[in-house]
């Protein structure tokens, strides 16, 4: 099937590579001429394991900056553009509106328009209304909501091995679900067919629940600290309950990234628009917003002042196996340490400091260069190389003894056997 994907970002490129790998004739289009030029040369604009190789292998995947002509060529169009948060927390659909404008001029034959972008409930119905208002016959298209549930660092695998595929359609649409199923026919997945708003809300509910698990375990970690108990034991025990599950029960500095913070804010805004109170949603965000402060207090308890202290931070990205620093708790940590007068040094295998921090934080290409002569070390992102770290070497070159485990993943006994002090959250 000939398919157009609008948006050459994280979701759009992963989708394009995945569908090309199962035999579809793919065009990935984006108005960013420079990005498309780089993609044609095989240069991927971000780090995602396996994606670059997958794209280079696909002879049936092309790139174009001609959005309208690309859409005209294809009977199926996926929309995968960003919906970043506005200052009030609502989703900014500016890029989506631009695509709708192009669509209104590109639809000359029947199109199945499939939205991958995370959008507030009611958005896809509004897209249909806007296209009809612009003069497009309602017989020439159908709108489908098909949200993505990708994990950065595992995106290509998740696209090809999904735990579910959600298909949202209009009530009178009796053909689009079958078309979407045929697109994914070579992928083993359960299908959930629902309304457009149902599909939009499933995406938000999915991320809300995962974020809630993280905030739940972080609040439990605070209680564990008060009673000198180990949150790791609690996580392991309750995770064995099949009603709860073991995933997303790792206490630490909190969630970040491009999805959870944005989607929780957008869901809260959508609820407010319908005068619906959101007690749990607010609590989840509040716990996450205040979690980093607990670590700052923990660091301060070891020093009379942080002014002039050298801080080594391992990790810049919001999670391992990605270079994404959007809403990264590691970045927030470094901002706070710099404000408190620390001389901050950082290392990450893939991510680069945001521009606003480069005058205040020194980034190194080697971890031990960041650690040398540091007064304390903070593990902010659990990259695999940090889990197999040479702590004896770290102890030899550090000035101070303090290691803060911001992800509760380090082996405390091993580190303290090297003469260091290791502390996390919710652990005695």
From Swiss-Prot:
Functional description taken from the UniProt entry: Catalyzes the conversion of UDP-glucose into UDP-glucuronate, one of the precursors of teichuronic acid.
Catalytic reactions on record: UDP-alpha-D-glucose + 2 NAD(+) + H2O = UDP-alpha-D-glucuronate + 2 NADH + 3 H(+)
PANTHER family reported for this sequence: UDP-GLUCOSE 6-DEHYDROGENASE TUAD (PTHR43750:SF3)
Similarity field: Belongs to the UDP-glucose/GDP-mannose dehydrogenase family.
Protein name: Putative UDP-glucose 6-dehydrogenase YtcA
Listed EC numbers: 1.1.1.22
Organism this protein belongs to: Bacillus subtilis (strain 168)
Encoding gene (name): ytcA
SUPFAM superfamilies, A to Z: 6-phosphogluconate dehydrogenase C-terminal domain-like, NAD(P)-binding Rossmann-fold domains, UDP-glucose/GDP-mannose dehydrogenase C-terminal domain
Lineage: Bacteria, Bacillati, Bacillota, Bacilli, Bacillales
Signal peptide coordinates: 1-23
GO molecular function, one term: NAD binding
């Amino acid at each position: 099937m000939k398919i157009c994907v609008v948006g050459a970002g994280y979701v759009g490129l992963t989708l394009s590579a995945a569908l090309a790998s199962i035999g579809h004739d793919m065009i990935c289009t984006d108005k960013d001429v420079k990005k498309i030029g780089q993609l044609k040369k095989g240069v991927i604009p971000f780090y995602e394991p396996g994606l670059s190789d997958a794209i280079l292998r696909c002879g049936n995947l092309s790139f174009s900056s001609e959005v309208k002509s690309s859409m005209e060529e294809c009977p199926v169009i996926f929309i995968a553009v960003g919906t970043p948060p506005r200052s009030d927390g609502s989703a900014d659909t500016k890029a989506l509106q631009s695509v709708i404008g192009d669509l209104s001029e590109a639809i000359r034959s029947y199109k199945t328009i499939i939205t991958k972008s995370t959008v507030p409930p009611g958005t896809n119905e509004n897209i249909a209304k806007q296209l009809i208002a612009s003069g497009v016959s309602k017989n020439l298209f159908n709108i489908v909501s098909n949200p993505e549930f990708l994990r950065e660092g595992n995106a290509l695998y998740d696209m090809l091995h999904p735990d579910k595929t959600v298909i949202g359609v209009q009530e009178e649409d009796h053909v689009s679900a079958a078309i979407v199923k045929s697109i994914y026919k070579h992928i083993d997945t359960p299908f959930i067919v629902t309304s457009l708003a149902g599909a939009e809300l499933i995406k938000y509910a999915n991320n809300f629940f995962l974020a809630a698990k993280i905030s739940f375990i972080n609040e439990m970690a605070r209680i564990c600290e008060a009673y000198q108990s180990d949150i790791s034991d609690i996580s392991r025990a309750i995770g064995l309950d099949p009603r709860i599950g073991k995933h997303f029960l790792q206490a630490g500095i909190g969630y970040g990234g491009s999805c959870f913070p944005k989607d929780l804010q957008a869901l809260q805004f959508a609820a407010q628009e319908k005068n619906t109170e959101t007690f749990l949603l607010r609590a989840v965000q509040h716990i996450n917003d205040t979690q980093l402060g607990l670590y700052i207090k923990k660091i301060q308890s070891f020093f009379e002042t942080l002014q002039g202290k050298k801080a080594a931070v391992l990790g810049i990205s919001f999670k391992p196996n990605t270079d994404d620093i959007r809403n990264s708790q590691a970045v927030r940590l470094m901002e706070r340490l710099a404000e408190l007068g620390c001389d901050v040094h950082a290392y990450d295998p893939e991510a680069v400091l945001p521009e606003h921090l480069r005058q205040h934080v020194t980034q190194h290409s080697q971890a031990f260069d960041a650690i040398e002569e540091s007064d304390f070390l903070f593990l902010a992102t659990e990259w695999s190389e940090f889990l197999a770290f040479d702590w004896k070497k770290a102890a030899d070159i550090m000035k101070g003894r303090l290691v803060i485990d911001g992800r509760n993943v380090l082996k405390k006994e091993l580190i303290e056997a090297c003469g260091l002090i290791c502390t996390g959250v919710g652990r005695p």
